[in-house]
Structures are given as structure tokens and as C-alpha cells.
Amino acid sequence: MKLTCVLIIAVLFLTACQLTTGEQKDHAQRSADRNSKLTRQCTPVGGSCSRHYHCCSLYCNKNIGQCLATSYP
């Protein structure tokens, strides 16, 4: 009797694991598709900007509203 219960629980557990794994693969694909559609393009050096994160170089001179190249020592 105990062995039968253990086997039934094991089969149910394995079935549930397979079902959730299949759903995760589909969910991951949908998330990747959604993220690729939401990806924003950055502004190249010399382009207009109002925030640092708009620029590919991550440096925006807000006084002139232009993306500048960053120079590191």
C-alpha cells in the first residue's frame, strides 16, 4: 500500500515537472521576443540627447544637448 502511494506521488511529481518545464521554454521565448521589441537604440556620438542614457557613449552634454565621446586617462 505504501509503495503504491509512493509510486503514484512520484509519477504525479514527474508529470508536473515535465509540464512546468515545457511552459518555461515557451515563456522564455515569449519574453525574449517581447524584450527584443522593447529594446531602444542609443544615440551615436554627435547626436542630440537630453539624458546620459540616451547616448551610446553614456555621456550627454546637456548644455549643448549633444552626445559626446568619453575619454578615459
From Swiss-Prot:
Could you list this entry's UniProt keywords, alphabetically sorted. Disulfide bond, Knottin, Neurotoxin, Pyrrolidone carboxylic acid, Secreted, Signal, Toxin
Record-given protein name: Conotoxin ArMKLT2-022
Query: Its GO CC terms?
Result: extracellular region
User: What organism is this sequence from?
Assistant: Conus arenatus
Cystine links in this protein are: 42-56, 49-60, 55-67
Disulfide bond as UniProt keyword: yes
Q: Which Pfam families match?
A: Conotoxin
Q: What's said on domains?
A: The presence of a 'disulfide through disulfide knot' structurally defines this protein as a knottin.
* Keyword Transcription (UniProt): no
